[in-house]
């Protein structure tokens, strides 16, 4: 296997320091050499990490920034040598890299037109996917371009029920199984803490001294960054309505000039909203997973919908959130 050296200066923290909410944990820097895995092997590793709640970003068969961070974080959490080498047993956890998905009649009901203007969107009851490609890519945590690459020659505008598609063999984000409503507290996770690293673009959850999961995020922007400090989750909702207020989004000032946008995968906050005790700030999903970790947001902590759907089952209302 051909090797290249990709020196990754990734801040993996001291677990003990991470358990303390009063200080920003000091970084540990690990220079990591990663093998140049072929596309299928990289995909298998992405699937393994994703299924283990160490999100590598969108699955695309490439060794990108979040693939590296997820791999080192997983090794850190499981007391493994922090190198880029991968033991064969990791790959053995994903014996089948790809699977098939058959387009269903009900899938087509999840697709529709979404007007570009927020005033028009506010008149709707649901903001659906705008294409079957987006539906399938999000279901399998993948880049749209990768799904297209795996299915050459497919006419995505005219796919019919019964057609079969090749997709990564990852645990799917089954959008139809999520019902609008509040997320209850989970006493079992009352001691867990959420750390939002605005420099590495990561959300990490700790249970006492144990790293539980890591997901890539977009944490605010230069003009309206995620608020540094210690906060708490006040409440959480699945398929939330979103109060679109440009004053709040751009300047952090609530106004009466707003639109209530209905829920759906094309809602700006996606499948989940977890509100913090900081007005207008929350942890939420997105209508554009392709941009996670790269494009800016409006002060909030944004995840891909497939990661947001999982984070609600890994934390609890009332948990401490430390943004640094």
Placement of each model-derived feature along the sequence:
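Boundary at the C-terminal end of the N-terminal hydrophobic targeting segment
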Residues: 17-19
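Extracellular LysM carbohydrate-binding repeats and other cell-envelope/extracellular binding modules
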Residues: 65-110, 146-182
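Sec/Tat-exported extracytoplasmic proteins
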Residues: 50-58, 74-82, 94, 136, ...
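Sec-dependent N-terminal signal peptides
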Residues: 4-12
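Solvent-exposed, polar/charged alpha-helical surfaces in well-ordered, non-transmembrane soluble domains
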Residues: 40-43, 47, 65-76, 88, ...
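Exported/periplasmic cell-wall-interacting domains
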Residues: 154, 251-324
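Primarily a LysM-type cell-wall glycan-binding module
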Residues: 36-69, 103-141
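Cell wall/extracellular polymer interaction/catalysis modules
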Residues: 143, 154-230, 235-240
């Amino acid at each position: 296997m051909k090797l290249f050296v990709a020196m990754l200066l990734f801040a993996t923290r001291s677990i003990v320091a991470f358990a303390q909410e009063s200080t920003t944990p000091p970084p540990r820097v690990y220079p990591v050499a990663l093998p140049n895995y072929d596309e299928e092997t990289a995909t298998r590793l992405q699937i393994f990490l994703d299924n283990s709640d160490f999100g590598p970003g969108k699955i695309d068969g490439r060794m990108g920034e979040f693939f590296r961070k997820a791999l080192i974080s997983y090794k850190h959490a499981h007391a493994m040598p922090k190198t880029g080498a991968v033991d064969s047993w990791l790959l053995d956890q994903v014996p089948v890299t790809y699977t098939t998905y058959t387009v269903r009649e009900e899938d087509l009901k999840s697709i529709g037109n979404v007007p570009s203007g927020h005033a028009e969107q506010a008149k709707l009851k649901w903001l659906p996917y705008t294409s079957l490609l987006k539906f399938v890519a999000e279901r399998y945590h993948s880049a749209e371009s990768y799904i297209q690459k795996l299915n050459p020659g497919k006419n995505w505008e005219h796919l019919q029920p019964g057609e079969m598609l090749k997709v990564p063999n990852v645990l799917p984000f089954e959008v139809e199984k999520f019902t609008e409503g509040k997320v209850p507290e989970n006493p079992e996770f009352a001691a867990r803490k959420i750390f939002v690293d605005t420099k590495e673009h990561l959300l990490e959850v700790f249970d006492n001294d144990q790293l539980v999961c890591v997901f890539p995020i977009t944490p605010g922007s230069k003009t309206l960054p995620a608020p540094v400090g210690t906060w708490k989750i006040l409440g959480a909702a699945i398929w939330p309505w979103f109060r679109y207020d440009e004053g709040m989004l751009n300047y952090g000032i609530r106004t009466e000039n707003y639109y209530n946008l209905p829920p759906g995968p094309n809602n700006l906050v996606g499948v989940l909203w977890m509100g913090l005790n900081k007005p207008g700030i929350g942890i939420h999903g997105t209508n554009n997973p392709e941009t996670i970790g790269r494009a800016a947001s409006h002060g909030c902590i944004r995840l891909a919908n497939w990661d947001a759907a999982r984070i609600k089952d890994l934390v609890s209302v009332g948990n401490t959130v430390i943004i640094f």
